[in-house]
Amino acid sequence: VGSSTLLLAFTLLDKPRMLSRADLPRLLVLALLGHTLYQFTFIFGIDRTSASNSALLISMTPVVVVLLGHMTGQERSSSLTWVGVTASVLGVYLVMDPSSANGGSIVGDLLILGAAICWAFYTVGSKSLLGRLGPLRLSAYTMALGSLFYIPFGIPSLLRLPFEQVPWTAWLGTVYSFVFALSAGYFFWYYAVSRLGATRTAIYSNLTPVTGLAIAWLTLGENVSVRQMLGAAVILVSTYLVRQSRITETEV
């Protein structure tokens, strides 16, 4: 709710965009997929499977994006694109710590895979609306509508929450989450899709394990294995390949 309020406030600074009644069904679908279902499947998924499985399955997002782009006719990807996307998944597998593979469950794995599929549909399905509404308004509208689906689940939990016992660090984390992880994150994602296209944007999401690896090494002094360095190199090269590959976008 805080994130959607923040983004809606920023839309007042944006130039006016026309929103027709015919846009509402698609906005509702995008809100349900990209905000409600994605968050539910991702959060409950990582709670029920290993970090290793989560990283690998969520890295399937670019693969699903390429498939959806091809099926809908929005993007025609070259062979180099397919090579880069596939290699990126391999890179994520190499970066993962094999010791964290224990503790996974089929339910958790399916939930994470569902999250990847929801995010892919959210990315590819935004194309026609992005051109007219722009990334800021589309992010704000879908986030606001997505928040409505949380109400039946969120209000009972809030009523039971002992606010006086919540530490200030938790409040700080909440503010950071809705300002940066949600508001800024969703906006920049759609901004990138509007500039780069769905596939080229999606491939950058697989840089997350590389970033996490680098931060853990720099700030926590964690050891980085040869396997992980090789995986990071594969991800970087595959991202470059997709960035340089020929992807033909069509108006849908």
Locate predicted features.
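Helix-helix packing/entry segments at the starts of transmembrane helices
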Residues: 1, 39, 54-60, 123-148, ...
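Structural signature of hydrophobic alpha-helical transmembrane segments
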Residues: 1-2, 43-61, 105-118, 169-179
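Membrane-interface helix-cap regions at the ends of transmembrane helices
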Residues: 3-19, 40, 87-103, 145-171, ...
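Hydrophobic transmembrane alpha-helices of multi-pass small-molecule transport proteins
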Residues: 6, 28, 60, 68, ...
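Specific transmembrane alpha-helical segments of multi-pass solute transporters/efflux pumps
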Residues: 8-53, 57-58, 94, 178-196
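Cytoplasmic-side transmembrane-helix entry/capping segments in multi-pass membrane proteins
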Residues: 22-30, 77-89, 108-109, 133-143
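Glycine-/small-residue-enriched transmembrane alpha-helix faces in small-molecule transporters
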Residues: 101-128, 136, 149, 250-252
